Amino acid sequence: IATIDCSDYPKPVCSLEYMPLCGSDSKTYSNKCNFCNAVVDSNGTLILSHFGKC
């Protein structure tokens, strides 16, 4: 199972770095920061499906 540490989030601004992650919502997030901010917003219901595009 792929895991990612989001303990340092949310962050007010994310970089434009492109390292796609696929969330359990079948949405592709452009990088860890965008994904982790979404995890925080989801109250932990969003998890990482896999690294790379969905």
From Swiss-Prot:
GO terms for cellular component: extracellular region. It is found in: Secreted. Residues 4-54 form the Kazal-like domain. Disulfide bonds join C6-C36, C14-C33, C22-C54. GO terms for molecular function: serine-type endopeptidase inhibitor activity. Coiled coil: none annotated. CDD domains: KAZAL_FS. This is Ovomucoid. It comes from Spheniscus humboldti. The lineage of its organism: Eukaryota, Metazoa, Chordata, Craniata, Vertebrata.
